[in-house]
Amino acid sequence: MTGARALTLAALLLMAPAPVHADRARDLADLGDRTSVEARQRGARALGQSGTMGDLLALVRALHETDPAVRAFSETSMWEIWSRSGDAEVDRLFAVGVEQMTAREAEAAVETFSRIIRRRPDFAEGWNKRATIYYLLGEYERSLADCHEVVKRNPYHFGALSGYGMIFMRLGEPETALGYFERALAINPNLQQVEETAQVLRRLLIQKRKGTI
């Protein structure tokens, strides 16, 4: 997410009324309401609290909406759903790990997310956060291995698919990188930086095939 998109989303969150309580069935109905964009915005936002992994397909569809607020809320809600394990201790550790990442305490964060993975190997976001840290440490093979685990558990994880692309760029495999970026964009076409990188790679590969570079 770019800085501009983050500011836009923050403004939308401030303007939109917060849901009083989580009602998944109601929120899904709102998201699917083709007669009211306000209802779809409300549903897209509220599913961040009430939604489950089973609601991801509905949110993926909403990522392709014409209304920018619906798209932004849907993306945020997907991340919120992904970040809930259903295990209070894992969720506590997850918050600790995110704080460690923010503080750039890489080794401590790796250990925290490794603890999460050992306790709840089915929790895809534990693998994703560790993959991110490994990437930042330059441990690309380990990061790739964790990305495999993420996508195996959550095939809609556009963040992990984008991560694959970033890793393969570092490994000097632009064609493979582009393939993963395009897979991420097929799920979430709102990833501006990913789209810009994909455009650069397409031009690079065209020039390479023509023998001009």
Q: Each PLM stretch: what is its role?
A:
Residues 99, 178-213:
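Terminal, low-structured helical/coil segments at or just beyond the last alpha-helical repeat
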Residues 49, 80-84, 102, 136, ...:
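Register position in tetratricopeptide repeats
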Residues 37, 90, 124-125, 158-159, ...:
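Helix-start (N-cap) detector for alpha-helical repeat units in TPR-like alpha-solenoids
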Residues 21-32, 52-62, 87-94:
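Amphipathic alpha-helical scaffolding segments comprising HEAT/armadillo-like alpha-solenoid repeats
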